[in-house]
Amino acid sequence: MFKGSIPALITPFTDNGSVDEKAFAAHVEWQIAEGSNGLVPVGTTGESPTLSHDEHKRVVELCIEVAAKRVPVIAGAGSNNTDEAIELALHAQEAGADALLVVTPYYNKPTQKGLFAHFSAVAEAVKLPIVIYNIPPRSVVDMSPETMGALVKAHKNIIGVKDATGKLDRVSEQRISCGKDFVQLSGEDGTALGFNAHGGVGCISVTANVAPRLCSEFQAAMLAGDYAKALEYQDRLMPLHRAIFMEPGVCGTKYALSKTRGGNRRVRSPLMSTLEPATEAAIDAALKHAGLMN
C-alpha cells in the first residue's frame, strides 16, 4: 500500500513567520517530479508543534490539492489529546488524504492500555488507513509490539507503523505480532538500509526533503533486492543523514535546502534558524559528498 521513499515534508515560512504556501506547493511539486513515492505533511519535520490548528489543516489541504492523487498523502494527525487527534484525523479524511500518521501521545506518558485506548478511539472515528508513529526519543513512550499487534487485530484500518525506535529487531517482532502484511516504514534515514533488510518496505524520510531522487533510487534498489546498489547510495547519503541532525529539529534540513534550492531557513521558536559554523560546514561537506552541491 505504502512503500519506498516518503518525505516527511518541511513547512516553509516567509520572512514574517507565516506559512509560505507558494513555497510549500513548489516543494511538493519538486518532490513528486524527483520520484518520491508519497508525502507526509505536518509531521515532526513539518514543525507541527508550532503550527496553529488552522495552519495545520491548511497545510494538509494544500498538500492534497497539489499532489492531486499522483502520490499518496499520509497526513499528520497526531496529538497527546485524544479528542484533538480525532479532530485532526476527521479533517484530513474530509480533505481527501489517503492515510493518517498518528504519533504516540507525547509528554503525558500513557500506559500500554492508554495507548491502545487512544489509537482505538482514532481508528473508530475514521475510515482511513492509520500508520502508527512510534518515536520514543520524542514522545517518551514506546508502544510495544504486543500492543501494536492487539491494535491491528482490533482495527482493520490500522495498517502500518513509522518506526523511529532505532531498534532493528523491532521489524521482526512487529511482523510476528502484526502479520506479514503490516506495512513497516523506517523513521530513521541512517538505519533504513538495515530496516528494509529486516522486512521493512520504505522510509518516511527527512533527508528526502533535500535529496528526493537519491532517496527514491535508494529505496527502489532495496525493494528490487539489489542491496549492493543500495549500499552505494547509503554511503553517498550517510554524511547528510548525520549532518542535518547535528543540531536538533529541522534547522539543518532547511539550511541544506537554502544551499541547494534557495529556500528560506526560517523555523519557529523555540527552534533556532541559525546554526553553529561547524554544523553549516558539515552540511556543506555532506551536500558535496552526495553530489548535491559543487
UniProtKB/Swiss-Prot annotation:
<feature type="binding site">
    <location>
        <position position="204"/>
    </location>
    <ligand>
        <name>pyruvate</name>
    </ligand>
</feature>
<feature type="active site" description="Proton donor/acceptor">
    <location>
        <position position="133"/>
    </location>
</feature>
<comment type="subunit">
    <text>Homotetramer; dimer of dimers.</text>
</comment>
<dbReference type="GO" id="GO:0005829">
    <property type="term" value="C:cytosol"/>
</dbReference>
<keyword id="KW-0456">Lyase</keyword>
<feature type="site" description="L-lysine inhibitor binding">
    <location>
        <position position="80"/>
    </location>
</feature>
<feature type="site" description="L-lysine inhibitor binding">
    <location>
        <position position="84"/>
    </location>
</feature>
<feature type="site" description="L-lysine inhibitor binding">
    <location>
        <position position="106"/>
    </location>
</feature>
<dbReference type="InterPro" id="IPR020624">
    <property type="entry name" value="Schiff_base-form_aldolases_CS"/>
</dbReference>
<comment type="pathway">
    <text>Amino-acid biosynthesis; L-lysine biosynthesis via DAP pathway; (S)-tetrahydrodipicolinate from L-aspartate: step 3/4.</text>
</comment>
<feature type="site" description="L-lysine inhibitor binding">
    <location>
        <position position="56"/>
    </location>
</feature>
<dbReference type="GO" id="GO:0019877">
    <property type="term" value="P:diaminopimelate biosynthetic process"/>
</dbReference>
<feature type="site" description="Part of a proton relay during catalysis">
    <location>
        <position position="107"/>
    </location>
</feature>
<dbReference type="InterPro" id="IPR013785">
    <property type="entry name" value="Aldolase_TIM"/>
</dbReference>
<dbReference type="Pfam" id="PF00701">
    <property type="entry name" value="DHDPS"/>
</dbReference>
<protein>
    <recommendedName>
        <fullName>4-hydroxy-tetrahydrodipicolinate synthase</fullName>
        <ecNumber>4.3.3.7</ecNumber>
    </recommendedName>
</protein>
<dbReference type="InterPro" id="IPR005263">
    <property type="entry name" value="DapA"/>
</dbReference>
<feature type="site" description="Part of a proton relay during catalysis">
    <location>
        <position position="44"/>
    </location>
</feature>
<keyword id="KW-0457">Lysine biosynthesis</keyword>
<dbReference type="GO" id="GO:0008840">
    <property type="term" value="F:4-hydroxy-tetrahydrodipicolinate synthase activity"/>
</dbReference>
<dbReference type="GO" id="GO:0006090">
    <property type="term" value="P:pyruvate metabolic process"/>
</dbReference>
<keyword id="KW-0704">Schiff base</keyword>
<feature type="active site" description="Schiff-base intermediate with substrate">
    <location>
        <position position="162"/>
    </location>
</feature>
<feature type="binding site">
    <location>
        <position position="45"/>
    </location>
    <ligand>
        <name>pyruvate</name>
    </ligand>
</feature>
<feature type="site" description="L-lysine inhibitor binding; via carbonyl oxygen">
    <location>
        <position position="49"/>
    </location>
</feature>
<keyword id="KW-0021">Allosteric enzyme</keyword>
<dbReference type="InterPro" id="IPR002220">
    <property type="entry name" value="DapA-like"/>
</dbReference>
<dbReference type="InterPro" id="IPR020625">
    <property type="entry name" value="Schiff_base-form_aldolases_AS"/>
</dbReference>
<comment type="similarity">
    <text>Belongs to the DapA family.</text>
</comment>
<keyword id="KW-0028">Amino-acid biosynthesis</keyword>
<comment type="function">
    <text>Catalyzes the condensation of (S)-aspartate-beta-semialdehyde [(S)-ASA] and pyruvate to 4-hydroxy-tetrahydrodipicolinate (HTPA).</text>
</comment>
<dbReference type="GO" id="GO:0009089">
    <property type="term" value="P:lysine biosynthetic process via diaminopimelate"/>
</dbReference>
<keyword id="KW-0220">Diaminopimelate biosynthesis</keyword>
<keyword id="KW-0963">Cytoplasm</keyword>
